[in-house]
């Protein structure tokens, strides 16, 4: 019997669909689709531990970020090309996503050892680059607009489609 057939008989195909429908980004939806059916008891146990820890966080931890999960993959992939740049909207999205990552890592660093150990271990591999967020903060205000203190050249580059109000 194939794994797809076993998955359908057990109803996990429907569970996958329910989870996929609740995903807030294209990346999360794709990751859900890529998850493979498993019969390995060790892997199933690990997945259940992660799921249960996240369920507990969602139910009881008010300080865990519930928003700010933005799909940045498309414009970050473009930035790997030499000479590419980022538009103002994408820069604002990146700022939000970096802040969410910072808040997630802060949440787990403030949690006592032994609480949510599996998720804490998973999050421990996240590397933050505060310089990037600080640099974005020198460019954008809290509303995602170019700050008045941004250089004239940067201001004009980011707003090339409209005349600079500084003129």
Predicted regions and their residues:
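Conserved amphipathic alpha-helical "coupling/scaffold" segments
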Residues: 1-146
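Charged, surface-exposed helical/loop "interaction arms" that form contiguous linear patches used
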Residues: 145-159
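Conserved small/polar residues in nucleotide/adenosyl-binding loops
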Residues: 160-167
